[in-house]
Amino acid sequence: MSQSKYRQLDVRAPRGTTLTARSWLTEAPLRMLMNNLDPDVAENPHELVVYGGIGRAARNWECYDAIVKALKNLESDETLLVQSGKPVGVFKTHENSPRVLIANSNLVPHWATWEHFNELDAKGLAMYGQMTAGSWIYIGSQGIVQGTYETFVEAGRQHYQGSLKGRWVLTAGLGGMGGAQPLAATLAGACSLNIECQQSRIDFRLRTRYVDEQATSLDDALARIKKYTAEGRAISIALCGNAADIVPELVKRGVRPDMVTDQTSAHDPLHGYLPKGWSWEEYQQKAESDPQGTILAAKRSMADHVQAMLAFNEMGVPTFDYGNNIRQMAQEMGVSNAFDFPGFVPAYIRPLFCRGIGPFRWVALSGDPQDIYKTDAKVKEIIKDDKHLHHWLDMARERISFQGLPARICWVGLEWRQKLGLAFNEMVRSGEVSAPIVIGRDHLDSGSVASPNRETEAMRDGSDAVSDWPLLNALLNTASGATWVSLHHGGGVGMGFSQHSGMVIVCDGTDEAAARIARVLRNDPATGVMRHADAGYDIAIECAAEQGLNLPMVAATQGNAK
């Protein structure tokens, strides 16, 4: 069988209520797979790349065709197994089991390196699924906008008395994830300078309104920043160039941003971080002809980039890693103090994780934006008193362009996810929305990931690298009846540095769906509260008690403490 990773084909998910599969429970993963490869969604859809370096939706186009065929023919009591983007089996299960189970990029720990993975990938034996690329629940840059917004807002609270007006953020990377940064900074009230080495990515973010304007040079960018901050305007500026050149140059000039981070694809030095002095075309060619030399050149440039970030940190500028493992890469190149600045989770996000709060998202399978606007209103109706959340939803409607099927991201926790899911299911039942809705999340969530350089960095009990938790999360979501469940390795931070799981559940308006939703959307965020309570976080222990979670050892510990 040929193994083509390139096809000149534009894929778009069907819209409306006409099924192309045998039920909405199989139509949903089919549409979401296709949506991941929509040209308005994916970074490089003709090569099956959704985002994050080489994060793919299917191993090759032949596998894609086979997945589509399998989903169209899947019965209501069958489950499709997908192994690193390849459909490998269809088995009889039962109607409340997942319709699809996915495992992507998983390697035995000793062999969990980019070198070994790339060998397997070249042989057609593996696929890098990132987080939501290979699990078919990517919704474009919106998927990370609110998390980035919450991070910037919390940084503003901690460092600038709660306001980022008149301040600016320095960052880099305008790919599928990094592309959220300029809009998130704007929504948080800050200007931003966003460095990106590929003009095509800047064009994509300008077209989708994630970035406001592009500067012609560094001097032009700084002049714009000076003007807009003086006026108190929150404008995002893109600059085409290499962060490994520009960030050190800013240090050399004595420029002082108000916040510094980075979201280049540093997790993948072979495909995701342009070495200094190279063109993108040269980078791609050398990745094929001299992979080891290319990796070394990229990591050397990352070291220069991180040293400049460290210099800003030493100046007292709030500086943090945004989860791309750039500190690790720099440390491997001899930057011994690379971890002197923190990751964004321990610095700003962990208290949310302790309450099971994370990136809850949903998609209107109808393709009708009105269905999303109606669900926005339903969220406000149910969560009446959360002004911060209402403000987010208002800003999202005003500023966020839908990519592919209309979708919404909304950070909510254990207390609310089940209630929202049941309400959405009732909206489908009553005809208030025109077609079923799928609910999912990023793998970056409170109980679904082990990533010592990102989500589980600096855990209170030292359990940063314990990956039992995402495995338990995937098992519990399978037992609870999620429509599809995924278990991945290497997302966000690269091979050897993370394991993580995802779930998606369909609201089709039936009683059976309501029962599954009630289980999944309680149990899934509850694993995050459990994980953090087990690690000794008081916020999580209190949340577990408030929500009536049965955590035997936490209860025993609390009893002994009393």
Curated annotation (Swiss-Prot):
Reaction it catalyzes: 4-imidazolone-5-propanoate = trans-urocanate + H2O
Q: Which Pfam families match?
A: Urocanase, Urocanase_C, Urocanase_N
Q: Which SUPFAM superfamilies match?
A: Urocanase
> Catalytic positions?
410
* EC number(s) from the headed UniProt entry: 4.2.1.49
Q: Would you name any one GO CC term? A: cytoplasm
Question: Its annotated pathway?
Answer: Amino-acid degradation; L-histidine degradation into L-glutamate; N-formimidoyl-L-glutamate from L-histidine: step 2/3
Task: Kindly list the positions annotated as binding NAD(+).
Answer: 52-53, 130, 176-178, 196, 201, 242-243, 263-267, 273-274, 322, 492
Q: Which cofactor does it need?
A: NAD(+)
Q: Name one GO molecular function term.
A: urocanate hydratase activity
- Kindly give the Gene3D superfamilies that the UniProt entry links to this protein: Urocanase like domains, Urocanase superfamily
Cofactor stoichiometry and binding remark: Binds 1 NAD(+) per subunit.
- Keywords of the record: Cytoplasm, Histidine metabolism, Lyase, NAD
Give its localization: Cytoplasm
Q: Which GO terms describe its biological process?
A: L-histidine catabolic process to glutamate and formamide; L-histidine catabolic process to glutamate and formate
**Function of the molecule:** Catalyzes the conversion of urocanate to 4-imidazolone-5-propionate.
- Family per similarity comment: Belongs to the urocanase family.
Q: What is this protein called?
A: Urocanate hydratase
What is the organism of origin for this protein? Klebsiella pneumoniae (strain 342)
User: What is the taxonomic lineage of the source species?
Assistant: Bacteria, Pseudomonadati, Pseudomonadota, Gammaproteobacteria, Enterobacterales
Per the record, the gene is hutU
